[in-house]
């Protein structure tokens, strides 16, 4: 009886280790993203690629068209 419990516990532990690696690799925590309205982008923001290009000239990593008024918001890691 004791041997079967030990065998079951060993099998269960190996199965849990195998299943935990199937869930994907551990990833590091992502940095928070801060946003600021672009100072150089003028007019209605229609194309996000245009907004991102302007934001990169301002030193940000990218940009998105946001809000009801379609303004260009630049993004960077905090």
Swiss-Prot record:
- Give me the Gene Ontology terms describing cellular component: extracellular region
Which cysteine pairs make disulfide bonds? 34-78, 45-65, 51-72, 55-74
Cellular compartments annotated:
Secreted
Give the tissue specificity: Predominantly expressed in the pistil during all stages of flower development.
Could you tell me which CDD domains the record lists for this protein?
Knot1
InterPro entries, from UniProt?
Defensin_plant (IPR008176), Scorpion_toxin-like (IPR003614), Scorpion_toxin-like_sf (IPR036574)
Keywords from UniProt, A to Z, are: Antimicrobial, Disulfide bond, Fungicide, Plant defense, Secreted, Signal
Q: Answer whether the UniProt record assigns the keyword Mitochondrion to this protein.
A: no
Give the signal peptide range: 1-31
* Xref: Pfam families: Gamma-thionin
One of the protein's GO biological processes: killing of cells of another organism
Q: What does this protein do?
A: May be involved in the defense of the pistil against pathogen infection.
The text of the family note is: Belongs to the DEFL family.
What this protein is called in its record is: Defensin-like protein
């Amino acid at each position: 009886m004791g041997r079967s419990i030990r065998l079951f516990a060993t099998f269960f532990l190996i199965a849990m280790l195998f299943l935990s690696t199937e869930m994907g690799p551990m990833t590091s925590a992502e940095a928070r993203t801060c946003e600021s309205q672009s100072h150089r982008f003028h007019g209605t923001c229609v194309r996000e690629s245009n907004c991102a290009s302007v934001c990169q000239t301002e030193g940000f990593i990218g940009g998105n068209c946001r809000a009801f008024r379609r303004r260009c918001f630049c993004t960077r890691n905090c």
